[in-house]
Amino acid sequence: MKRFVATLPLLTLTLLLVTGCSESGAPTDGDGGSDDSGGGLLKVSGKEAETGNYIVLGTLTDQFDRAQAKANVEDTLARHSDIAAMVGLFAYNPPAILEALQQADRLGEDQTVQVIAFDEADETLQGIKDGTVYGTVVQNPYMYGYKSVEVLAALESGKTDVIPKDKFIDIPARQIRKDTVDDFWTDLKAKVGGDAKNDTKEGKPRFAYVTNGVASFWTIASKGVIAAGNKLGVNTDVLMPAEGIADQKRMIEDLITRGVQGIAVSPIDAENQVDLLNQAAEKTRLITHDSDAPKANRLVYIGMDNYTAGRMCGELIREALPKGGKVMLFIGRLEQDNARLRRQGVIDALLGRSADNTRFDPADKVLEGR
């Protein structure tokens, strides 16, 4: 998910094209001319979705800029009046979708756009209760935080058996619909309520939990970090970089200098952070959470299988649109391991493909299918 605010004035569009029944170049209007009216959005007028036929118009990225996230939705509404579903793949995307739809008077009894979500923002859960959001796929950020501290503390005490052979501790995602949202929300509120703090414990190890940004998702995770620290009698720090990859780099370098006993990090751009992460791994215990860095020397990844979670989201889209339709995906960025896998899982499930987490649809083709 990533979840911090960074200012980026330009709209970034990564086309996701759905392979299935057919594959083509960029969609055109009825007379074969492409839409170059600006903004980089695809136009698929004159190509109506047939029964059970899904057309993914593209994926709009916002680089974690909330204003841009909303602008992406507004542009989509302006260019695709017959859009059937909007899918928000990071925690703040569904609220941005709902806000834009509300201002466009597209929510309520006559709502024609299905909203499918990721994560458990209050606006998303309330939308499921109200019927303006079909459903969401939720992670378990509280357990991401709790388990990260638990594993680091175990390693500090010499218990290496906490690391599975595949170096992956799975905290499964789940689908939330209207019939389960009340119970889920009640449980969530119970976990994150209160203002517990992790007071300094003299002579005890210190572990750092580094997020990839600032968001309510990470506030939930921080509650798990604090709870585990207090239960296990260790010191914990939660660091949320508000200014992107450079900010996260500075934090990790500072933690290395300080000599903390362990770092749990959600890499912003794992491909380009391998050297930094390996530097940390040489000096302390390094694990990843939420988004992995499989090429780095991390000890274990704690999180969900993002490809599987993406497929779960694709299933929700198919439920919401049994007759097919045009779909737009919204996400922060695609440089992250979790984002790429999540997006691909959505596409594959939406098209009824077999599971293959090594598949990656090219960005220069339009794909559609049933």
Sequence positions of predicted segments:
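Low-complexity, intrinsically disordered short peptide segments enriched in small/polar/basic residues
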Residues: M1-K2, L15, L41
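Bacterial N-terminal signal peptides that target proteins for export
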Residues: M1-P9
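C-terminal motif of bacterial Sec signal peptides marking the signal peptidase cleavage site
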Residues: L16-G20
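A residue-level marker of the well-folded mature domains of exported/periplasmic proteins
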Residues: C21-R370
